[in-house]
Regions:
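A short, N-terminal "cap"/entry segment at the start of jelly-roll beta-barrel domains
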Residues: 1-26, 40, 108-112
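Conserved short histidine dyad/triad with adjacent acidic residue
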Residues: 16, 29-45
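Ligand-binding loop in jelly-roll beta-barrel domains
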Residues: 22, 80-106
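A generic "binding-loop/recognition-motif" signal
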Residues: 37, 46-47, 66, 82-83, ...
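Glycine- and acidic-residue-biased ligand/ion/polar-headgroup-sensing regions
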Residues: 46-48, 52-58, 63
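Short acidic-glycine-tyrosine-enriched beta hairpin
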Residues: 65-80
């Protein structure tokens, strides 16, 4: 698996750390959102996602919950099929791990 960063249409940059059929229970990716950028509304079918914030400051929106500010050490739980997006509200890159269970598959992704 390539560990090179790539841009996704959602509006952020992704580096896949672990996403193989050898470990179908989970995938781990590093996500980077530049300052001032909001990712597109999207959801993952039959996949629970967790954001583990590593660096920067963001505002995360999950389903019908009130938007909340997140920073290093915060964990965001995103249930399956729940709409989500995140905004970088800081002056530096917002960096977080996106941990999916089961592992991320393109066919589970839907932009809204």
């Amino acid at each position: 698996m390539s560990k090179e960063e790539f841009h996704v249409s959602e509006g952020c940059f992704i580096t896949e750390w672990s996403n193989t059929s050898d470990d179908p229970a989970m995938s781990i990716a590093r996500a980077r959102v530049p300052p001032g950028i909001t990712t597109r509304w999207h959801r993952l079918a039959q996949t629970t996602e967790r954001y583990v914030i590593l660096h920067g400051e963001g505002r995360v929106e999950v389903g019908d919950l009130e938007a909340r500010t997140v920073g290093p050490g915060d964990v965001v739980l995103i249930p399956p099929a729940c709409r989500q997006r995140i905004t970088n509200i800081g002056k530096t890159d917002l960096v977080f791990l996106a941990i999916c269970t089961p592992r991320f598959k393109n066919e589970a992704y839907e932009e809204l």
